[in-house]
Structure formats: C-alpha cells, structure tokens
Amino acid sequence: MASRVTTAGRGVRTLGALCLGLLVTASAAAQSSYSRGQGVWPAFEGWWQNDDGTYTLFFGYMNDNWEQVLDVPVGPLNNIEPGGPDQGQPTRFHPRRNLFRFEIVVPADFGDKELVWTLTANGQTNRTYASLRTDYLVDKQTIATEVGANRGGVSQDWQWNEPPTVRLDADEPRRVKVGEPLTLTAWARDEDGIPSSTKMGVTLRPQGPRSARRDRHPAYTPPRQIVPGTNNGLRFSWYVYRGEGEVSFDPVQMKTWQDSRPYANSPWSPPFVLPPVPEDGKYEVTATFDEPGTYVLRALAGDGALFSWQDAIITVDP
C-alpha cells in the first residue's frame, strides 16, 4: 500500500479555525472521562493545495474512551462519500485524540464540494464534513502546533521542516499463521533535524518547600496548556490501522495516540524520553496475531511535528 506523507504545503489557517480546534480539545478535556462505552468523532483537520493544483484533505478522530479500542469495518457504519465507502480511512480506532491519521487527495476542480465521513461506534453516529473552506487551510506550522511540537508553541523554522522518511523491507513475508511471530523491518530517518530534539525530562532542586513546589515531578503537575506537549525528535512505531484481531508487538511499541497520563509510554506523557535512534535507522519488531484475517499495520515515523508512514498488508491464516 502506498505511503501517505505529510509534506510541504502553503497557506496559513485562520485564527478562527485554529481556535476552533483548541476549543474542541478543551471541550473534550472538560467532559467526564470514560474508559469505554462512548462513541468516536471523525475529524476533518484541514487542507492545503499541492504543487500540481490538487488538494490534500487531512483527517483524524477523537475516541471518547480512554481504554476501549473499537473496530468498525468499512461499510454502512464507516464510510466516506461521495466516492466511497472506502477512501483509506482506518477501521481500528485507538483511544482519545488521533490527529492527521490519513489523507485524501481531491482534484483541482473540487470547488465547493465536500466529503462526508460517517462513523458509528457504540451505537453513536457522528459525521465530519470536509471542504475547501478557507478557515480550514493549514500549513506545517499549524500541524506542528496542533500535534504538540514544542509544547504547542510556534517556530519559524518549522516552515522548512520535512517529515522523516520511512522504508519497509519489501522482501519480508506478508503471510503468517495465527500465533506465529512475523518479523517486520523498517528504516526511518529525520534528515533535516527540524525541529531540534527536546526531552520532557525532570530537573529537581532540593532547596526548601517553595522550590519543591516549583520543581515537583511532572507526574504530579496538572496540565498548563490546551494542546498536550510532545517531545521533538525522531520517533517510530508500528500500530494496527485495520484488522479486527489483537496484535502483539515485541518490543512493545510506544503509543501513537495522545495519551497524556503520566508514565503512559506515549510521547505526550510526562516524563517520557524518546528512545535512542539506531545508527543505521533500522527498526525491527515481531508481530503476533491472535485471529485470522487481513490486517493493515502502519509504520509511523514522526519528528514531533510532521509524520510519514508506510503500510504493510498482512494475511493471517488459521
């Protein structure tokens, strides 16, 4: 399956659209937290124009559950129209906010048309409407801010940022039996080093009660920003994009969704520190499947601001 890469774009999203995105995040945070039983909100993240005159529409979603992972096959309960029902959307929905999960390229004459993504999960039907409204125009800075790069801050350098590159081993088998480990190999690199690496580390100063309050461990510090902050620097993970069975990865992969709880194995989770980048950029993992079927496993690389991915289609036999 071809990769979808968040790359160069032009234009600046208006303040109104950016504030809308922040309000959605704030509203979600203000609601009562649920472990399971809630719905999933499809999200239109924005658009930009490509050099050839076509447009890229960006989509993500908000799973209102903190623990429940939902599988919704493409069809009446998960469709994008017109032109669907299958337009590359996920069928596995991981918890909480998952930003910029897939893209749809529309022609230069798309005009005032719109795409509608309808999603029903846990008996709740929600929709998002994608169009070329100017208040949804995004650029690299907008994307970086919304995913939490530099704690949701801004940097002029990000306009020159390019996403990491991802490559899969094309010679590896893509067919396996239930319970049989499958080796997956990928290479990921961040060639430009933008944004520069940061760490959500901890610096403690053992001087008096006031200093202790100021420098207390981030695990016990309430959030002070609407957008969850993340480390800058190369990170890589495999995750299930489509498929209804459980997949176990060894080693365990860091989360690709915004889990901001302390010690949650997530780049948005304090005091998480990104693992060292292999010198050769090679990442190797084994995946074990507990049910037969066809799976799409996504190899996702990010630098804290932009993402690239490649998909591996795996056939699992009984």
Task: List the predicted regions and their residue ranges.
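Short, compositionally biased P/S/T/A/G/V-rich stretches that sit at domain boundaries
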Residues: 40-44, 135-177, 183-185, 189-195
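Short tyrosine-centred short linear motifs in exposed loops/low-complexity segments
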Residues: 53, 108-113, 179-182, 281, ...
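Extracellular acidic, Ser/Thr/Pro-rich low-complexity tracts
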Residues: 63-65, 174-177, 188-195, 226-229, ...
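Residue-level recognition of secondary-structure-to-loop junctions
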Residues: 49, 277, 287-291
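C-terminal edge beta-strand
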Residues: 309-316
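Bacterial N-terminal signal peptides
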Residues: 14-25
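Low-complexity "stalk/linker" and mucin-like segments enriched in Ser/Thr/Pro/Ala/Gly
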Residues: 90, 205-283
